[in-house]
């Protein structure tokens, strides 16, 4: 619809902070609509110390049964995806898709560098979830970016979208 298109366009035209805030908003809405309550079931933007004494601030920490915690970090690459999805010319579309995949790879490197598994005060699972809030973008990664999924898995990162979150 027109309102949704205008909201999406304003987010795309905004900076990476606006896009990140939007991704976190989508993630939080999914958690709440699944019946999870903050701060009992999950926490957002909480600062933790890692084993080296450095501050770490994952987007979301979901508290699981058995005193285990699941870290979810929202990574939004809306600009590159929007350009790909809204281009008709196949040559330019291919160029934008490569740019989109490159931005996903950069997000993976950033998440790997954050090294959330080293957070001291929580018992993280072996894998971090990298949340991509745009379902068609996730599907495109699954269909065309198999090397990205394998790269993520090697880094102990699972890429997820709204429909693949585990609740």
Question: Which residues fall in each region the model found?
Answer:
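Amphipathic, heptad-repeat alpha-helical coiled-coil/stalk segments that mediate oligomerization
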Residues: 1-167
């Amino acid at each position: 619809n027109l309102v949704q298109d205008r909201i999406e366009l304003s987010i795309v035209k905004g900076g990476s902070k606006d896009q990140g805030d939007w991704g976190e908003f989508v993630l939080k809405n999914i958690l709440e609509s699944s019946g999870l309550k903050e701060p009992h079931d999950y926490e957002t933007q909480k600062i933790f110390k890692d084993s080296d004494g450095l501050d770490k601030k994952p987007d979301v920490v979901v508290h699981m049964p058995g005193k285990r915690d699941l870290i979810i970090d929202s990574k939004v690459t809306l600009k590159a995806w929007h350009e790909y999805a809204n281009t008709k010319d196949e040559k330019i579309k291919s160029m934008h898709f490569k740019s989109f995949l490159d931005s996903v790879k950069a997000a993976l490197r950033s998440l790997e560098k954050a090294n959330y598994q080293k957070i001291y005060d929580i018992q993280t699972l072996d894998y971090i979830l990298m949340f991509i809030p745009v379902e068609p973008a996730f599907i495109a990664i699954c269909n065309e970016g198999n090397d990205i999924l394998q790269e993520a898995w090697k880094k102990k990162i699972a890429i997820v979208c709204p429909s693949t979150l585990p609740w």
